[in-house]
Every structure is written in C-alpha cells, then in structure tokens.
Amino acid sequence: MQRFFFCPVCGQKFNHEFLYGKDRLICSECGRVHYENPIVGVAGIVLNQEQKILLVKRANNVSYPGLWCIPCGYLEYDEEVRKGMEREVEEETGLIVKAKEVFAVHSNFHDAKQQTVGIWFMTEVMGGELLAADDAAAVGWFALDHIPDLAFPTDELVLIDLLNGKVRK
C-alpha cells in the first residue's frame, strides 16, 4: 500500500522503479529514492509483586478501541528509546517507571498502513499514581494466564514469554 506520492525534497511525483531488489519510489524530478522505513514503538512491561502485568484498555478515539495492550506508544523523533518508553507508560498509566533491560524486539505487521518495530522493556516503578490517561480508557493488573482480548499480536508473544518464565529481573 503506497503511503507517499510526492518527494519531500522537491515536491514532484514519485515513480515506481525496481531497485535493489524491490519496487521503490523514485522522484521523477530529483531522482531521490524514498525508503519507507518502519516507525519505532516502545512498550513498558510493568509487573507487580504478585507478578501480575499492567495492561491498558485502548480508548475509543484510537486504533483497536476496547482492546487491551501493554502500555506503549511511538518514539518521538529526537527521543532516546528508554526515555520514550518511560514517557509513554507515564502518559497512559500515571506511573513513573525506570527502564530496565530490553525484554523483546518484534516487527509489527498488524497495521497494513504502518509497519513498526516494537521494543519491550522491563521496568521498575519509581512512583506516580495508577490512573488511565491519554489514550487509555482503563488500566488493570492481570495474571499472566488470564489476559483479556489484546489489541496487538506481538503483545501476545511477549506475554507468552513472560508466562513461560522468561522474566528477567
């Protein structure tokens, strides 16, 4: 699915050409090759003392409304990945977390209009007050073997790894 039609450098139309083994968008005027790269998503795995995971229920004004997910969001252009994850968790849950180690990295193909690469971090809660905010309609703690309907297939992969004891502390 083509998302871009005009060159961001000179404004002219893109042509399709086979280059480097793929169909590419090439500017008809300046010859610039436009590479469509995935966007980086970040997610924070927050576990409580009972090893329940914090999930957010997606609000009605975002994609996949009413479904649950690990607190997540897109990385800003000039943002370090750990700081981006910490920001997203706080925006959606009210909790202030510290990024620990990377737990998982997955390519996300669930949205045909936008491929993402997701990075899931383990976290440590540093403070804050748990409340649904930003694009979250609700927040809740769930046992790893009793998870509600999820928005993203890759969250399911992460939860399976957590359930199978691949928790790194």
Language-model features: locations:
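Conserved N-terminal beta-strand and adjoining loop/helix that marks the start
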Residues: 29-53, 74, 105
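Acidic, metal-coordinating catalytic segment for phosphate/diphosphate chemistry
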Residues: 2-43
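Charged phosphate-binding loop/patch that engages nucleotide di/tri-phosphates or the phosphate backbone
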Residues: 160-169
